[in-house]
Structure formats: C-alpha cells, structure tokens
C-alpha cells in the first residue's frame, strides 16, 4: 500500500521484532532520526532515556486500553458505529483508543 501510494522506498520503514532487541537498536542508533511509540509508560521511559544520547525526536503515546462504555438506554444503532470509529481512529495508534467496548449483558 505504501509504495502503491507513490511513497518512495525507504521513506516509511516497518520493522518487526522484540523490544529489547529491535527497539533498543532503534532507540540508540544515531542513523534513526525520530521514534514514534504507542504503548506502556515503562517502555516510553526506556525509549526517552535511550534517545537522549543521540538527541533524536521522540513522540510517545503512553497509557492503557481505554474502554468505551455504552449504557442500556443508549441508541445502539447510533452508538456502535461511533464506538468502532473511535477504536480505529488514527489506525488505533493512540493511548486513548477506545479498543474495549463494554455493554450491558442483556443487550
């Protein structure tokens, strides 16, 4: 999708691997100019500390999984599409992404 959109190779790079190995290398490597991370506060602190030595820019979205609570008297036809939109806004990459949906059991 990225290349089909006309974005040149190397502009966007997606790496898979464990945080202690790949994440650490990205954090301390001087060839990496910026890190954007969504996840726990503990990992965010580790990234910030490692990135400080190379003065790289860091964007952190830290926190937990936010619930979206729909009460029994809600208009479900209206609320459910909005809840799904909220969960996937910004591709779900936000500390406040409402990725848990709580509804009454009888609904």
Give the location of each predicted region:
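Well-formed, non-transmembrane alpha-helical positions, independent of function
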Residues: 25-26, 82
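ALDH superfamily catalytic-core signature
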Residues: 34, 40-107
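PLP-dependent aminotransferase-like
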Residues: 1-23
């Amino acid at each position: 999708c990225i290349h089909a959109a006309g974005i040149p190779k190397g502009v966007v790079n997606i790496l898979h691997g464990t945080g202690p190995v790949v994440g650490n290398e990205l954090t301390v490597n001087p060839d990496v100019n910026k890190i954007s991370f969504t996840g726990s506060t503990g990992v965010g602190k580790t990234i910030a500390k490692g990135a400080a030595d190379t003065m790289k820019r860091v964007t952190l979205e830290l926190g937990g999984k936010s619930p979206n609570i729909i009460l029994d008297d809600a208009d479900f036809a209206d609320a459910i599409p909005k809840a799904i939109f909220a969960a996937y806004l910004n591709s779900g990459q936000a500390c406040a992404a409402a990725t848990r949906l709580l509804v009454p059991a009888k609904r």
